A protein has these predicted regions:
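His/Glu-based metal-binding/catalytic segments typifying zinc-dependent metallopeptidases
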Residues: 1-33, 118-141, 203-300, 458, ...
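Generic solvent-exposed, charged/amphipathic alpha-helical segments
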Residues: 25, 37, 82, 157, ...
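Short alpha-helical segments and helix-capping/turn motifs at coil-helix boundaries
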Residues: 146-147, 157-166, 259-262, 277-281, ...
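M16 family metallopeptidases and their MPP-like homologs
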Residues: 2-10, 39-152, 172-182, 188, ...
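Long, compositionally biased intrinsically disordered regions
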Residues: 149, 162-249, 390, 399, ...
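Glycine-rich, charged/polar anion/phosphate-binding loops
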Residues: 10, 48-51, 161, 260-263, ...
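Conserved active-site and cofactor/substrate-binding residues in soluble primary-metabolism enzymes
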Residues: 31, 76, 155, 354, ...
Length: 570
């Protein structure tokens, strides 16, 4: 069950509100330990709480959502939100949280890193947030630096507290939305549809039935009909001459700094240093790998020796562009038949060059000073993690099915499954539902993994900056590396991943079913070439699209192939 508290906030033509409510979302809800989120969790309303500000419509909506709550908690949900906000409005919002929120969003605005999405496309989409509603104001949200400066000046003035009063507490333009599951709803709706169709069919004459059959045959013929050459010629396409044969340059320079291997990437970054500390996981036993996934989820959102987890998050975002952790896999494409790979636990951060020492200090605080024995917080994180995994399985059922199927035969996929997929979810679910019986084992394993991997001899660094940023990094590395775990290292040799072939299904509340079939074409005697990427396009947009989606009426079908021989259909 989902409980949602929503308020309309002005219009998207107000550039100050456009950013101010992003900052409020951070300070009140999104940051770990944020007061409104904490109040709802402490009240037992939902296993996870999130906020959002939909600013891409003319009347933006600020929302507070509790997941896995109960319908009976509606009044408590409303009163907890409003009582907490009244108290915050009277006593004031944590000023450091506001500064952290402003810096967080300003850093990302200046950095303009949209990952794999073209920067021009993302800027163009943002223009529509205002341009759709006033043709003379396409750029108001692109000129954000003066707005950020304005918001910084308002931190001590009560401006943000007044926004809470005006647009949330005293604003009648809002809604409470409850979404609750109904067991057997899909079966009931299918039966109702079948009954309606049966009644409809009985009311048709023989001529009307014949007309339907004829129309269906005409549709099938249309679906199978080849497009006319003159119609195909109207579609703009790239020629080979339009595609460069030159690959983008790769800047990798292997160095040593204070006895630590450093992979340096000399790229102009506008004064930002991008740091990744990689810790080898190759000697962590298979049965402990799910706990490595949990450790990755815990670090950064649990108390440390010097900070509460909310204070830690704010301290990071006041001084840096953020810190995150992940588990990564690097396959050896020269040994695909042996299926060799390297797994790492990574902590990544970015900061302006003068703040790199603070970045490393915060990374050290997370890795070495986290209170992994905090039972109450661990239980909260497990509940949140379980809920988010459930949500991700529903929203990305195709990738979930492919990963699980590949894990039957691929050690690489098996690693991913037990650290982030269904295998991982099964461990998290068991720990969360049997926490009192399992908590000592959980804490022991988290501490064991941390002690074994966060060591100088287990560390490699990757760093991206212009040349002037390299000296700053080399000055900061020794103190960080020397602060890691020392002493005799417990070793169990190279981890061996065991795969087991299965045929299994998992039931969810989604109406869409996903069926995956996977295998390894290199094991079958074939080899990887770039032609397989062309085959993927042909299959996905021609054969599979026509036969599965257009003619078959299914939701869709996808395929894929990679360098290590893994292939899938889903």
């Amino acid at each position: 069950t989902y409980l949602s508290y929503n308020k309309v906030v002005g219009t998207s033509l107000d550039e100050k509100l456009y950013l101010a409510f992003e900052i409020l979302d951070y300070a009140l809800l999104s940051a770990p330990g944020a007061p409104l989120k904490k109040a709802l969790i402490d009240a037992g309303i939902g296993k996870d709480v999130s906020g959002s500000f939909d600013s891409g419509i003319y009347q933006p909506v600020f929302s507070i959502v509790a997941k896995n709550a109960n319908v009976e908690q509606k009044e408590a949900f409303i009163s907890t939100i409003e009582d907490t906000l009244r108290k915050i409005a009277e006593e004031g919002i944590d000023k450091k949280a506001l500064r952290a929120g402003i810096n967080y969003h300003e850093f990302r605005f200046r950095e303009a890193d949209f990952g794999s999405y073209p920067r021009g496309l993302m800027y163009g989409l943002q223009l529509f947030d205002s341009w759709l509603y006033d043709e003379e104001k396409p750029f108001i949200h692109m000129k954000a630096i003066p707005t950020f400066e304005f918001l910084k000046e308002q931190i001590e003035t009560g401006y943000f507290e007044e926004l809470i009063r005006e647009y949330i507490l005293d604003n009648p333009h809002g809604s409470i939305v409850i979404i609750r599951p109904e067991q057997g709803m899909t079966a009931r709706m299918d039966k109702e549809l079948a009954d309606r169709l049966q009644v409809y069919k009985k009311g048709l004459s023989a001529e009307e039935i014949e007309a339907l059959v004829k129309a269906t045959k005409e549709l099938e013929a249309y679906q199978e009909e080849e497009s006319a050459p003159e119609d195909l010629a109207k579609i703009p396409v790239l020629g080979r001459e339009d595609i460069s044969r030159e690959i983008a340059p790769i800047y990798n320079e292997e160095r040593q700094t204070d006895g630590v291997k450093l992979l340096y990437h000399d790229v102009e970054t506008n004064g930002i240093g991008y740091v990744t500390a990689l810790f080898d996981l190759s000697e962590i036993e298979e049965e402990l790998l799910p706990y490595a996934g949990i450790l990755q989820s815990v670090l950064g959102i649990i108390d440390t020796e010097h900070y509460g987890y909310g204070e830690l998050f704010n301290e990071i975002n006041v001084h840096t562009g953020g810190i995150g952790t992940s588990l990564e896999l690097y396959t050896d494409v020269t040994k695909v038949e042996e299926k060799e790979f390297r797994a790492t636990f990574e902590i990544k951060g970015k900061a302006l060059y003068p703040k790199l020492d603070v970045l490393f200090a915060m990374m050290r605080e997370i890795l070495m000073e986290s209170k992994l024995g905090d039972e109450k917080r661990l239980k909260e994180i497990l509940s949140m993690l379980k809920t988010r995994l459930q949500t991700s399985f529903l929203s990305a059922g195709h990738t979930t099915a492919v990963l699980r199927s590949l894990s039957y035969t691929s050690p690489i996929a098996r690693f991913r499954d037990i650290t982030s997929g269904i295998g991982f979810y099964e461990v998290v679910k068991d720990l969360e539902e049997n926490f009192e019986e399992r908590k000592e084992l959980l804490i022991e394993n988290l501490k064991k993994i941390a002690g074994r991997i966060f060591r100088k001899e287990n560390l490699m660094l990757s760093y991206t900056s212009a040349q002037e940023g390299l000296a700053v990094l080399e000055k900061a590395v020794p103190q960080f590396a020397d602060s890691l775990h020392t002493g005799e290292k417990e070793s169990h040799g190279q981890c061996i991943i065991h795969c087991k072939k299965r045929n299994e299904g998992f039931r969810t509340s989604s109406k869409v079913q996903y069926v995956a079939r996977t295998g390894n074409f290199i094991d079958g005697g074939a080899e990887y070439t770039g032609a397989l990427q062309i085959l993927k396009v042909i299959l996905s947009y021609d054969y599979l699209w026509q036969n599965v989606r257009v003619k078959g009426g299914a939701y869709g079908c996808m395929s894929g192939f990679n360098r290590i021989g893994e292939g899938y259909l889903v």
